[in-house]
Amino acid sequence: MKAQFAILLITLVLFQMFSQSEAIFGAIWKGISSLLGKRGLNNLNDFDELFDGEITKADLDFMREIMK
């Protein structure tokens, strides 16, 4: 009886680990496939505008307005 209970507990733990790892691997695969797909590669070009290192006078004025 103890052996059957131990096997049941081990089976439940392994099944829980498998179901959680499947969700994690699915999320990782979705992220990788979105980066490598045509749309993912086209969307990466949009991020170039975010890393503009120049701060204009309009940016400074806007920041001053926010900080008031």
Curated annotation (Swiss-Prot):
Keyword Secreted among record annotations: yes
Compartments where located: Secreted; Target cell membrane
One of the protein's GO biological processes: defense response to fungus
Tissue: Expressed by the venom gland.
Residue numbers of Leucine amide PTMs: L36
Domain of life (superkingdom): Eukaryota
Entry's transmembrane regions: none
Main location: secreted
GO cellular component terms listed in the entry, alphabetical order: extracellular region; membrane; other organism cell membrane
Extent of the signal sequence: 1-23
Alphabetical UniProt keywords: Amidation, Antibiotic, Antimicrobial, Cleavage on pair of basic residues, Cytolysis, Fungicide, Hemolysis, Membrane, Secreted, Signal, Target cell membrane, Target membrane
Propeptide residue range(s): 40-68
Task of the protein: Amphipathic peptide that possesses relatively strong activities against Gram-positive bacteria and a fungus, but has very weak antimicrobial activities against Gram-negative bacteria. Also exhibits mild hemolytic activities against human erythrocytes (16 uM induce 8% of hemolysis).
Family: Belongs to the non-disulfide-bridged peptide (NDBP) superfamily. Short antimicrobial peptide (group 4) family.
Protein name: Pantinin-2
Organism name: Pandinus imperator (Emperor scorpion)
